[in-house]
Amino acid sequence: MKGMLRMGLVAVAALAAACAPRERTLVLLSTNDMHAKIQNVPRLPSAVEACRDTARLVVLVDAGDRWTGNAYVDMAPTPGMPMIALMNELGYDVATLGNHEFDHGQAFLGRMIDSMAFEVVCANVTSDTCTFPQLPPYVVLDKDGIRIGFVGVVTNYEGPGHPAGNESSFAGLEFPDPQAMALKYAAELRPECDVLVLVSHMGDDRDRELLAGGASQYDVVIGGHTHEEVDTLIGGTLLTQTGKDLRNIGVTTIRMKGRKVAGVDFRLVSLA
């Protein structure tokens, strides 16, 4: 009788373990403000591949300003293309726009977006021109059943009303308030996503303002624009930024229990 009882308890324990939420780890690799610093690229592929070798669920993300800052890239036959070719080769998944994406005008940027083999999202730029594509505000990726929403925003504070740059680069474009758009799409996506990420080129000061309001609903903010190294938790949201010039790559580890976020942490890996 006791033997049967022990066997029953073992069976119950095994069943409970089998029914328990599965624990998985999702890794977001992030860059921002690379500014064409292709001289710092050699260590990037090895860092990305090392992560992919050890983690099964990896997403590669960029928060804007991919060119303007290195003559080899900026004076190439197609300015900026060496960086885009590298990003395509590495298998980037998602990116948003930075202010320097507009440096060569809308038609040029439209062609560059067409050449990008990854999703480009920006929730606060609308276009009524035929030279610039209407970008999606977000994308939802599925990684092993985990639904990850990425919303993109770009600064409109320096223009004012648009990113810093030549006025002619922004004709026919409107840049609604990025914080308002970030909140709007967070509310829309949160019910259908297990993980929600804001890919922001507002600057960490504006990111902090957004999170301090307590209504963001994001799990992680991958930031850019202000060239800072940022790793802080605000109201339950992890705010990150990797600095500039491809000196670092950000590694955000999201621990999942079932389809819920159980914890997040961040570290920088030096590439310089």
Where is each model-derived feature located?
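Small side chains
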Residues: G8-A11, G149
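Acidic, metal/ion-coordinating pockets
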Residues: C19-L271
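Hydrophobic h-region of N-terminal signal peptides that target proteins for export
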Residues: V10-C19
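Bacterial N-terminal signal peptides that target proteins for export
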Residues: M1-G8
